Design a protein with these regions (language model features):
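A general "terminal functional-core" signal
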Residues: 1-11, 16-17, 70-425
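N-terminal low-complexity, Ser/Thr- and acidic-residue-enriched intrinsically disordered segments
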Residues: 1-66, 77
Length: 425
């Protein structure tokens, strides 16, 4: 297949970055990531798209009204705020600390991934990058694992207005349980998660035995790995599994969660990857030339996370980064070497080839359900998935109003009166 020129966009705006900087587990990480991307002049190679907060109806594509209404009550949270039982019922507490203006926070974060989906749907980009998204643990009824909103599921639901089959790939060191749970019964969204799986390691799910249920049987794939898995292991299993899933499922579009906490040196990970391991996986995905959304996720060594996501951005726009990191506001935090590469883990990879091959064989066996079954539209437990009567006709008659600004900035007008999508209850 001849190499295709990729149209790529980068979701960014001041509000989106500022809200992500407020997330307690990754405070100011968003600014560090964006600043590194800017310092390498990668912005000049990308169409910048400004997002706007998600509408209530968009958030309800996945989350329950009770959960959303509770988030609206968390308006002013200070040091004297006492977590109540009602908060804990919705997952607000230990790992998901209460934050002021919580509903605004989740609306803005979800809006970023919605902008990525709309950029793909409208043909603005073949690859949409949103490093501010990727919160894969949030459940329909509650926050979980540092994730207050499952922007990934909302993004996928928006993509399904146009694309029949969506392949979701999760590269985070933690299992993508929230997304898997959302599509456990679906045979139009295939979920693949490659992650660390050890006793006591969060979230405790993601075994090979979790393959989906009923009409979704065979459409969930987990590759559980022991700690310290390195580039060689990741590239081997991904190279084997991804192509088999792709050929069996034949997706129309792909969503990738690029959580950076599987990098060597992450304080909450336990993986042993370098930038090379991640980029090899992403390159395999991009080579399929399908419309693709790239999202962020975990990553608690903020400098390494910024290095990884800047490197993946460079891969998308076909730029080779200089090893020496350019001077910018966060440059002192990249010491003592100030280079873009990440040192591999010195410890031994605890995964053996025999176990990996056994896992791959089981995955191949499960894929027979995908090959044998025709894909049908999945309807969520919450409500009938919103659909578009005739997307093509709607796009022609009610084009999205776009404003082209200087410096390749594109603003998607999110006014309900101008929204191109007609939702049906």
């Amino acid at each position: 297949m001849a190499k295709k020129i990729i149209k790529s966009c980068y979701i960014w705006d001041e509000l989106l970055m500022a809200e992500c900087d407020r997330l307690p587990a990754v405070a100011e990480r968003a600014s560090r990531v964006h600043s590194l991307i800017v310092s390498y002049n990668l912005i000049n190679k990308l169409q910048v798209v400004h997002s706007s907060p998600a509408l209530y109806e968009d958030l309800k594509l996945f989350h329950s009204e009770n959960y959303l209404e509770h988030l609206k009550t968390l308006q002013k949270v200070d040091d004297d705020y006492v977590i109540e039982i009602h908060d804990e019922e919705f997952g607000i507490g230990y790992d998901c600390q209460p934050v002021s203006d919580m509903y605004k926070l989740v609306s803005v974060i979800a809006g970023g991934s919605l902008a990525a989906a709309k950029s793909i749907i409208l043909g603005i980009a073949d690859v949409a990058i949103n490093w501010f998204g990727g919160w894969h643990h949030a459940q329909r009824f509650c926050a979980e694992g540092f994730c207050y909103v499952n922007d990934i599921v909302i993004c996928i639901e928006k993509l399904r207005l146009k694309f029949k089959k969506v392949l979701y790939i999760d590269l985070d060191v933690h299992h993508g349980n929230g997304v898997q749970d959302a599509y456990n019964l679906s045979n139009s969204v295939f979920t693949l998660s490659i992650h660390k799986y050890e006793p006591g390691f969060y979230p405790g799910t993601g075994s090979m035995d979790e393959v989906g249920n009923l009409t979704g049987k065979g459409y969930t794939c987990n590759v559980p790995l022991h700690e310290s898995y390195n580039d060689e292991t990741m590239e081997y299993v991904f190279g084997k599994v991804f192509h088999k899933i792709y050929d069996s499922f034949k997706p129309d579009t792909i969503v990738v969660q690029c959580g950076a906490d599987a990098l060597a040196g992450d304080p909450m990970g336990g993986g042993g990857l370098t930038i090379k391991g991640y980029c090899t996986c992403v390159k395999n995905i991009l080579d399929k030339q399908k419309p693709t959304v790239l999202l962020g996720g975990g990553g608690y060594n903020f400098s390494n996370t910024a290095k990884l996501w800047a490197s993946i951005t460079a891969l998308v726009v076909d730029v080779e980064l200089e090893q020496n990191i350019p001077e910018h506001d966060y440059w002192p935090l990249y010491g003592p070497d100030y280079i873009i590469s990440i040192q591999p883990l010195l410890g031994r990879d605890k995964n053996c080839k025999a176990d990996l091959d056994n896992c791959i064989a089981k995955i191949e066996d499960n894929l027979k359900f995908v090959i044998e079954r025709k894909t049908i539209k999945h309807k969520t437990e919450q409500n009938e998935i919103s659909t578009c009567k005739n997307l093509k006709e709607t796009l022609c008659k009610r084009q999205k109003k776009l404003q082209i600004k200087e410096n390749n900035v594109l603003i998607i007008d999110e006014s309900p009166n101008n929204d191109v999508y007609n939702f049906i209850d």
